[in-house]
């Protein structure tokens, strides 16, 4: 799998029924209005026959589903035209720890190494009435039918392509039921569906997996960008949130990246689009279970990003959701990577944002809630960070709306200045 793996939560009617009462209460306050998207990063993706690592002391759940494989570039596709953009389908296992909440991104539950086995692709005539069977050690443990999905494969492709351009090789996992099958070390989990090649993977203890790992993770064209929400206390206060006690991490899809001196589109009929100046840490070598004391040894350098957000699209599901943070071209990054030796103290750098030459935002990395070594140690505790992966460390207070015609410059002292211009949907066509 060379593309991005997108997945959707709360897309099976059994999930919606189980959570119906909770949806009317805080922190949700209302049922989800749109598809609840998340990303399975490249460290999660394994192939048929490769082992699923079982982290000690956790409960691990199998999530048999189907992956839609994109066949050609898709942007703003109507559901009735979706079939023309689908190369085929494959069985998938959206492995996860149990989820007790859908409010914040579930990176610790869903983004662990090997937590997304993907099978071989094949054409399929009717994905909307497909029985998916899970076998554990040769015995059926569960089955369900895609007719019970809230949104069909075509509807999901249409919904995602409305804000994110999909590329050949991208995958969309269609969802899982509320009840999942528990796994144990030593199990062999096999997923079956008529017309698709079977997907089978052994489950091994994580420490055994680390000792005997003989394959390399599938690499994508770019590294994964992990982003931090509310990592400056003044920014959390600005948004009326209590500073988090654990890092609030979400993942940015590659479609959202754009470069220095490029444009970002403000969607029509939105009320609030704001910038976020951020220091980005670039990982230089494979990091797994790294201590804070040694974490900086895994840093290659630093760059700058502007993590734009469209606040109109915020919902209280995996907040901040992909419609807010992963729209096409909404994350300028660059203009270069500065070697870590050129930055004497990354925890004492001034960040500034200028809009049309006016200073709108200023802060310092000295005010980070979670330091760079802590973040590397935190993430590498449950997933493998790979060379080229990036961590956007958050933004200080000072947000304001930007509109078409604005020139936005974000800078990080000693790292660089990143220039970007806001345009309307019409001028971007």
Predicted regions and their residues:
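Short, conserved beta-strand element in jelly-roll/cupin
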Residues: 38, 67-72, 158, 169, ...
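Extended, compositionally biased flexible segments
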Residues: 1-72, 198-277, 420
